[in-house]
Amino acid sequence: MFWHLDMYPTHPAAEADEGRRGVVMESPGKVWLMTIEDEHWRSRHGARAEIGPLSISSGEEYSAQHVEAVFTPGMTAPDHFHSGPEAWYTLAGETCLETSDGRVQIGRVRGRAVMVARGLSMHLSATCTEQRRALVLILHETSQDATLPVHDWIPKRLCTQNPVDPPQ
């Protein structure tokens, strides 16, 4: 599965392309059609970004939670995990994500989208001097909560040790 993000000039234009797996959302002054489909799906219009593949289990039912996440400089999210993949597309600012598998990912404008596999514990912090804004997808198992707190993992604070983007 892939998360397709298409930007439109108006809400009605996005709704015309919505389809059964799409959601129209306005986020900072722009209209977005967010669709979860296979990699070959295309909207009829819209400026596009494509994120994936998102790893999901066949036979499992998933629900999508779409969020506009806003962080102030230096802000951190409580340590947490999801029962399915999470991805985000950064619109402004920058974040650093440390996961329980020892990886670090940087989310920034014109950078690669951040993708996190199900079940990984996460420590997320805004590492910029401006407000961070991102469109976020949490594709979680329908039978479970979208976000769950972490109590058995202590981050190594890798994001405070001058993280660099991993090689592409």
Feature map (PLM): residue ranges:
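Double-stranded beta-helix
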Residues: 39-51, 55-56, 127-168
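Short acidic-glycine-tyrosine-enriched beta hairpin
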Residues: 1-16, 59-63, 71, 95, ...
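Extracellular/periplasmic catalytic domains that process cell-envelope and extracellular macromolecules
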Residues: 25-27, 59-62, 81, 89, ...
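Ligand-binding loop in jelly-roll beta-barrel domains
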Residues: 19-31, 96, 117-145
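Short histidine-centered beta-strand/loop micro-motifs
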Residues: 76-82, 99, 106, 125-126
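Short, conserved beta-strand element in jelly-roll/cupin
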Residues: 70-71, 82-98, 139
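Flexible, surface-exposed loop/linker segments and immediately adjacent secondary-structure boundaries
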Residues: 27-76
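N-terminal accessory interaction module
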Residues: 1-44
